[in-house]
Regions:
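Intrinsic disorder/low-structure terminal segments
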Residues: 6, 31, 35, 42-43, ...
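Short, compact, well-ordered microdomains
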Residues: 91-113
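Long, contiguous N-terminal structural blocks used for assembly/anchoring
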Residues: 1-57
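Alpha-helix boundary/N-cap detector
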Residues: 9, 13-17, 21, 62, ...
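Intrinsic disorder/low-complexity detector
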Residues: 43, 47-50, 58-64, 72, ...
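Surface-exposed polar/charged interaction patches
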Residues: 24-32, 46, 77-85, 105, ...
Length: 114
């Protein structure tokens, strides 16, 4: 039997849904492993070209800087390595755990903490 090749589909995600995930992570979902600073006054103004989110990994001691494109990359990684969280996000049934996994995918390209 021939191996079936998967399809790749591109979808457009509204900015407010990405901001929802970011909010869930920053306001509770990821506070157990990270501290945050932002380059602009509004943490959620991801359209500002100077927007940068500094993420301090309190366990690992490293600091990471995220840009808008890292959010898109993180969402793609979320869909690949924790598809049930991605599915919850798409169905608008996401929670703080989904938001935390999203942020970890943005920062580490993996889910390191659980």
């Amino acid at each position: 039997m021939k191996e079936l090749k998967p399809f790749t589909v591109q979808i457009t995600i509204p900015k407010d849904r990405i901001v929802d995930l970011l909010c869930g992570a920053l306001e509770g979902g990821s506070n157990y492993w990270a501290h945050f600073q932002c380059s602009v006054d509004d943490f959620y103004d991801i359209d500002d070209p100077t927007w940068r989110l500094s993420v301090d990994d309190v366990d690992g001691g490293d600091t990471f800087t995220l840009k808008r494109e890292d959010l898109a990359k993180g969402l793609q990684i979320l869909s690949e390595i924790v598809p049930h969280h991605y599915s919850n996000f798409i169905k608008e049934d996401d929670d703080a755990e989904t938001a935390d996994c999203f942020l970890q995918c943005c920062v580490f390209e993996d889910v390191v903490y659980s």
